[in-house]
Amino acid sequence: LGLGFKILALVVLILGGYLIFNAFITKSRALSFSLNGGENADNDHQETLFWDLKKPIKIKITAPKGIKRYALKVTTKDDLILYEKENLVLDKPKSLEVPLIKPEIMGLEDKCLDYEVHANDWSYANFFNGNKAFFKQEVCVDTIKPSIAILSRSPSIAYGGSAIVIFEALDKNLSQAFVRVKKKDFKAFRLLEFKQRNIFIALVPWSYENKDFKAYVVAKDKANNSNATPLLFKRKTHHMREKDIDISALKDKILKQEIFQNDIEQTLLEMLSHARLKDLEKIQEIALKQGDFYKDFSDFQALKPLNEPFKMTNNFLERRRFLKDDQVLFQFSHLGVDLRPGKDLSLVFDPIIKRVFEGKLDFYGNSLINCYGLGLCVFLAHLKDDKSVGSSGLKLESGLHLGMLLQGVFVRPNEWLNEQWIKTHIIAPIEQAKRLLMKG
C-alpha cells in the first residue's frame, strides 16, 4: 500500500477514535440551571416568573467540569433584542450566578420578556468547545401592588371575640390575600359565588392573648408586590371575672374520679399544668388544620348543642384560681363556657358540621371537635359518649364544656350561641357585600 493510503487510514482511525471519544464524553446534562438557589429547572416544566424589578432574580449555572463561557440574551415577545452579551470565564468555577438584567426601556410594565442563557463547560466535548446547555425563562414585569376594597365587615369586635370581613383584592396576578392580626396571619376564603372576581371572606378572631386589636387586610401578587389596608372595627372590652376554688372543697367531688388514685394535690396540679396544656395544643392543632374549608355562612344559625334549654355558667376567660390555705397554687383562664342542661343530657348536632375529632383526652376526657367551615370549630368536652353529656376527664363543674375555635384560636362561645349576634355581626355583612357585588 502506498504512503498516501496509510496516512489517510491513520487520519480516519484518529478521527473515528476521537468521534467515539467525543460521543462518550459529551453529556446532555453536564450543565444545570436553577433559579434563586432553588431546585434544578428545565425548559419543559418552567413556570412564568413575575418580577417587581426590586428583588434580584438570579440564574445559577452549575457545571462539575467548570464553566467556560455563558451568554445572556433578553428579547420581547415580538423578538426585539433588549440585551445580548457573551462572557468568557477563565477561573473555571463549578457554579456561577447570573443576575437577570433589568430592562432599561420604558413601557415594559405588564409586559413579558424572554431571558435566554447559553453556557459551555471546560470539558473536551464538542471538539473542545465543551458541553453546552441552554435555558429559557419567561419573566413578566409587574411593579404595581394590588389594591384592596373592603366591601363589608362586622360593626364591632369584642376582646376574645369574632368578626367577619368581605373584601375584594384587585390584581390580575394576585397570589394570596389574608387578614393579619398583630403578627399572625389568618386565612381568607374565596367567595365561591363570585368566582370571576377576587372576592374573599374571612372570620377574624381577637385573641385573648392580645390586649389590643390591630388588624389589616393584606394582598400579595406573584411578583411579591403587597398592600395592606387597616381593618377597622369598633372594639369592645370585657370585665374578666375571677373564681377562687379551694382544693379542700374539691376532695369529695374529685375522689370519685378514677384519675385520682394518688395524692390529690399533686395529681390536680399535674393535670392543670401539663395535661390540660397538652390537650389544648392538640385541640388547637386539629381545629386549625381540619377547619380549613369553605362554607357559605349566609344562613348560619346559632349553635344549639343540647336538646332542651340550658343555663350558661362559668364564662369565657373566667380567671380560675386554685387555693390551699388562701395561697394560690395554680391559675388559668377558662377557655370556654359551661352549659347546664335540664334532665335531657342528649347532644344535638347541626347536619352541616364536619366531625374532625372524636376521642379521649387526658384532661378533657371524652371529647368531640366539629367544624363549620371558614376556620370555625366547636369543642365539646367531659362527655359520657359521642351522644350525651357526662363527667369524663377532670371535671370540676357540672354540665357541658363548650369551646369555640377560629383558625385555631379560642374565641367567645356565647357569641356563636346568640342568634341576634350572628344576624348582626355575620349574616348582615355577608348580605351587604353580596348586594354591592350584584350591583356590579
Protein language model annotation of sequence segments:
Residues 37-50, 152-158:
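Short beta-strand segments of immunoglobulin-like
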Residues 102-112, 205-212:
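Surface-exposed, short loops/turns at beta-strand junctions within beta-sandwich domains
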Residues 120-128, 220-224:
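Short, solvent-exposed loop/turn segments at the edges of extracellular beta-sandwich modules
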Residues 154, 161-164, 169, 174-318:
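Non-catalytic extracellular/periplasmic "stalk"
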Residues 296-308, 326-360:
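Short, glycine/small-residue-enriched coil/turn segments at secondary-structure junctions
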Residues 312, 368-371, 388-433:
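Conserved, short, structured surface segments that act as functional micro-motifs
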